[in-house]
Design a protein with these regions (language model features):
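Short, ordered loop/turn segments at secondary-structure junctions
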Residues: 15-18, 27, 32-34, 212-213, ...
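Short alpha-helices
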Residues: 24-65, 74-83, 281
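Accessory interdomain/linker segments of ATP-dependent helicases and helicase-like nucleic-acid enzymes
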Residues: 316-380
Length: 427
């Protein structure tokens, strides 16, 4: 609005589901706005901008501009578009898989931006055998740490730095912020778990959490952890730090299959006008702002809306598996074949299930369960992330076959996803 008042032409790009009222811009570029026939609806924000650049280049080509100046090679940006696609956890439809695959190809050829190269170095990762999983868990959190605790500028400056030394300086600053983020996240997660222990109804259809000491940039991570632990849609709130927004709290939510979080917030907004000051998001993740004094009303409305729209069996976590494997399948060739494919939302990595003998188990960093398993005389290493409770001597486990890279070595490792017991079923 300010730019329009100053006489500037304003172009807004977005990829979220649009609100009823669009921004006051000259052009709104969003494949998800009503009436837009662009076929790729699952693009992340960087993906939308990439296609806008492609369209702009095409228009300039038709105008004859490139008869006078060199045509830019936009493929040099595909590593950043791939990183953004992975980091934003958008559905990996056919087009997004192509983007990520091409981006990883260039990274493995060492044809990547200086900023991404610097981030891989501080993360201790090698560009020549990088995977989508490593970009998701090693690079993306370091970029996001800036926006969570400081300002997004640091991440942007790192990624657009043209020279390696400058990019590495920014990457090191992001590394320090990420370490700080981990500490704060652990503290907030412990607070959240303690709060849930005092809730009136631990079996409620949804969870709302708020602490005046929490950081608004980290509540989404807390909501994600609690959602995973309790398998309930979860929204975590923290005080707004924006000037002039005193008395408001910002929430970040994560949902489960069967509960569309943004549509749930939209229903609450229609039934309780003015309760939600602003909101937006997707089916599994959303953000919102409300007044602190309205939290009890919102919590009641949220649980009611979730329960109303929950299909039968929504709150029972079932792990779908692709079948059992033979001990002879536990090889690096199988692991490498699976690792070579780009997996993600809407294109999930295969999960297998077998009965194992648990030979040894120990906690790593008091957080992850490291396992030595055996099946029909074949030994295999495994890990269960964020699992502290020990396993029985024999267990029927759901798992992914992964390549573990550590100290320059690549080894096969099972990543445990679930265990069959009386409460959870493997289908």
């Amino acid at each position: 609005k300010y730019a329009k008042e100053k006489g500037l032409t304003v172009i807004v790009t977005d990829h979220h589901l649009p609100a009823d009222a669009l921004p006051e811009a000259d052009f709104v570029v969003n494949p998800n706005q009503h009436g837009d026939d662009f076929p790729s609806k699952a693009l992340c924000g960087a993906g939308v901008m990439f296609y806008l650049l492609l369209a702009t280049r095409s228009a300039l080509r038709e105008m004859g501009v490139y008869s006078r100046v060199p045509q830019p090679n936009l493929l040099t940006l595909i590593d950043l578009v791939a990183l953004a696609t992975i980091a934003d956890v958008v559905p990996l439809d056919r087009n997004n898989r192509i983007i990520v695959t091409k981006g990883i190809e260039r990274i493995r050829q060492n044809k990547l931006q200086s900023g991404l190269s610097a981030l891989l170095k501080v993360a201790g990762r090698n560009c020549f055998d990088i995977s989508a999983t490593e970009l998701a868990f090693s690079v993306a959190p370091r970029i996001n740490a800036a926006g969570r605790l400081s300002t997004n500028d640091l991440g942007v400056y790192c990624l657009i730095s043209a020279d390696a030394p400058t990019a590495f300086d920014f990457a090191q600053k992001l590394e320090e912020l990420n370490k700080e983020r981990k500490v704060k996240e652990r503290e907030m997660q412990q607070d959240a778990l303690s709060s849930i222990g005092t809730l009136d109804d631990p079996e409620a259809p949804a969870i709302c959490l708020y602490d005046p000491t929490w950081h608004s940039g980290i509540v989404g991570l807390v909501a994600s952890r609690i959602k995973d632990s309790y398998y309930r849609p979860t929204i975590a709130f923290a005080p707004s730090t924006e000037e002039g927004r005193e008395g408001e709290i910002k929430g970040s939510g994560r949902s489960i299959n069967g509960i569309h979080l943004r549509d749930t917030l939209d229903l609450i907004n229609k039934n309780h006008p003015g309760l939600i000051l602003k909101f937006g998001g997707h089916s599994l993740a959303a953000g919102l702002t409300i007044k602190e004094k309205d939290l009890p009303v919102f919590e009641k409305a949220f649980k009611k809306a979730v329960l109303k729209n929950a299909p039968s069996g929504t709150f029972v976590k079932n792990t779908l598996v692709d079948g059992e494997l033979a001990p002879s399948d536990f090889t690096m060739s199988v692991a490498n074949a699976i690792d070579s494919i780009v997996w993600g939302p809407s294109f999930p990595e295969p999960i297998f299930a077998n009965r194992f003998v648990v030979k040894n188990q120990k906690l790593l960093k008091d957080t992850h369960l490291k396992l030595d398993l055996e099946m029909d005389g074949v030994a295999v290493s495994a890990i269960w992330f964020r699992r502290k409770k020990p396993l029985p001597e024999r267990a029927y486990l759901a798992y992914k076959i992964c390549v573990n890279q550590w100290a320059g070595r690549r080894t096969l490792q099972l990543v445990i996803e679930d265990m069959e017991d009386e409460e959870e079923r493997l289908l």
